[in-house]
Regions:
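SAM-dependent transferase fold signal centered on methyltransferase-like domains
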Residues: 1-271
Length: 271
């Protein structure tokens, strides 16, 4: 317990951990000194009560409880405790930066809209290609185009929401240098998708879980030499291999329709 706090608190001179369950506070008080967090204070109280008496701080991190009084899991922000939407103005009055950890099940577009311009950054975090967390960074001043960061292990893609200009898009990968290729051609039309030219398109690409959650498919087309198969698809094709594509890649060897006879011939010999 308090893992997020233990990592973030290391970059601050003072840190305060607030938890309303006494047993979790006891665990934190035991663990923090062992982890070298002698500057961390543990308070067993309701976070809203502590917020009322809190002075000015550099940053506030909240991980709202996602279970109701009956122990059932909740997803909507208003159903979590505390309700960050209600406390937004007070939080930002106390700290210029507020980070909120939310369920990856949330519609992040609606969530950003609900905060009415207070969201400056959206971090969609995945590991092993499984979306784990949605992190919002709130700030003072109205933001109309928050930075969206899609992270899946070493793969990180960032862009400005509402602005598809490649000047606001960066790709980074710990193993590969950032690509400088920019492709602005339109997605494959419905007609060309139905009459797929396998002699030209040799590779199939599926974005990772964070990008799928973000839905930033136009950004992929702008940043990489890939073409969206269809507006209703999440798959892309390319004529050349792209080593640093943020997702899975496949070499296209054969193409068939869903005709049973054709599929049987194509898959003959496969086990």
């Amino acid at each position: 317990f308090g893992v997020d706090f233990s990592y973030m608190s290391r970059v601050f001179n003072r840190a305060t951990y607030v938890e309303q369950q006494s047993i979790l506070c006891d665990i934190a008080r035991h663990n923090f000194p062992i982890l070298g967090l002698d500057h961390a204070e543990v308070i067993n109280d309701d976070s809203t009560a502590v917020l009322d008496t809190l002075g000015r701080v550099s940053m506030i991190f909240l991980d709202p409880a996602r279970r109701d009084d009956h122990g059932s899991r909740t997803y909507a922000i208003a159903d979590c405790m505390p309700d960050v939407l209600t406390l937004k103005d007070m939080l930002l009055a106390k700290a210029p930066t507020v980070m909120v950890k939310l369920s990856p099940m949330l519609d992040w577009h609606k969530t950003v809209a609900d905060f009415a311009g207070a969201v400056h950054e959206v971090h969609i975090v995945s590991t092993g290609n499984e979306c784990k967390e949605l992190l919002l960074v709130l700030g003072r001043g109205r933001c109309v185009s928050p930075l969206v960061v899609c992270a899946n292990d070493e793969q990180v893609l960032s862009y400005k929401a509402g602005d598809n200009s490649d000047n606001h898009t960066t790709i980074s990968d710990s193993a590969l240098a950032a690509r400088n290729t920019c492709n602005t051609e339109d997605s494959l039309s419905e007609e060309s998708a139905n009459d797929f030219d396998s002699s030209h398109w040799k590779y199939l690409y599926e974005p990772n879980a964070s990008i799928m959650k973000a839905g930033c498919f136009d950004v992929l087309e702008q940043r990489f030499a890939v073409h969206h198969i269809s507006p209703n698809s999440h798959l892309f094709v390319a004529a050349e291999p792209i080593a640093d594509f943020p997702g899975r890649s496949f070499a296209i060897e054969s193409i068939a329709t869903m005709n049973k006879k054709e599929l049987k011939q194509l898959l003959a010999g496969l086990t």
